[in-house]
């Protein structure tokens, strides 16, 4: 009888040892699939759960890589957008490149070029509001300031017009592209930076940004303007207040509906 108990005990110990070994062994034994045992998880903890990579983002949003100190909860709005791009003659170079981005990423784009325009020219009219009503954009780009680099006392003379433009834009997400200075300005960039909210203003005049100039010495060449737009679009996806999909296009430029306004008198 004693030998029988000893034999049963040995068999139980052998079975337990085999169970423990299989629990730690892994996911397969030769060609047989073996589910990792919960016993091993109890002993060493479920390391696979702690080390699991995050699940992919939903279809409506996509996670964006962040620079140090940025909000890691920020996501990209992946919906197709109806974009309105308004501004001065800088749109001649920027517009076709943004059109290529729009075409590549499924957006629609309307460019409105008002030659020689300024914040005052736009802000003393309701033109912006009219174009918003006509084209119903859900995202706006603005490129203004190049004709105001040397305006003295600019806050006293331009702030109210800038405020009126922002009032016309309302709650529509937008990005304001600052001018590509060819000389130091008298305050236009500072006024824009201090008036607009974080992530709404792209400062184009920084030491690390280079511009090849056209014959007038002010406007960037077509190639340089395209590179400028590339930087803006990359910034929109990474750092702007409302990030949209702007993957770099294969085409260098594209056509879109464009409205031309003569210089204001």
Predicted features, each with a name:
Residues 19, 24, 39, 72, ...:
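Phenylalanine-focused residue identity feature
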Residues 1-82, 239-265:
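N-terminal secretory targeting modules
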Residues 84-121, 218, 222-265:
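Mobile, glycine- and charge-enriched loop segments
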Residues 2-11, 124-245, 259-260:
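Alpha-helical cap/lid subdomain in secreted, periplasmic
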Residues 73-158, 183-185:
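Conserved SGNH/GDSL esterase-like catalytic core that processes O-acyl groups on lipids
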Residues 71-76, 102-105, 166-169, 204-208:
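Short amphipathic alpha-helical segments, especially helix-boundary/capping motifs
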């Amino acid at each position: 009888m004693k030998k029988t108990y000893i034999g049963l005990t040995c068999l139980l110990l052998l079975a337990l040892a085999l169970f423990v070994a299989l629990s730690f062994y892994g996911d397969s034994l030769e060609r047989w699939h073996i589910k990792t045992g919960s016993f091993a998880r109890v002993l060493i903890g479920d390391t696979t759960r702690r080390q699991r990579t995050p699940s992919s983002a939903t279809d409506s949003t996509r996670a964006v890589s962040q620079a140090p100190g940025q909000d890691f909860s920020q996501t990209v709005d992946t919906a197709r957008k109806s974009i309105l791009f308004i501004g001065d003659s800088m749109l001649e170079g920027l517009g076709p490149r943004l059109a290529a981005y729009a075409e590549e990423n499924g957006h629609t784009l309307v460019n409105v070029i008002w030659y020689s325009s300024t914040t005052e020219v736009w802000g003393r009219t309701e033109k912006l509001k009219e174009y918003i009503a006509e084209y119903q954009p859900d995202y706006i780009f603005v490129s203004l300031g190049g004709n105001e680099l040397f305006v003295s006392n600019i806050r006293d003379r331009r702030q109210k017009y800038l405020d009126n433009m922002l009032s016309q834009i309302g709650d529509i997400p937008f990005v304001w592209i600052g001018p590509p200075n060819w000389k130091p300005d008298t305050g236009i960039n500072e006024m824009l930076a201090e008036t607009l909210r974080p992530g709404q203003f792209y400062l184009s005049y920084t030491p690390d940004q280079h511009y090849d100039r056209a014959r007038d010495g002010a406007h960037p060449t077509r190639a340089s303007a395209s590179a400028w737009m590339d930087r803006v679009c990359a910034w929109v996806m990474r750092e702007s207040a409302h990030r949209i999909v702007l993957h770099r296009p294969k085409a260098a430029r594209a056509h879109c509906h464009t409205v031309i306004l003569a210089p204001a008198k």
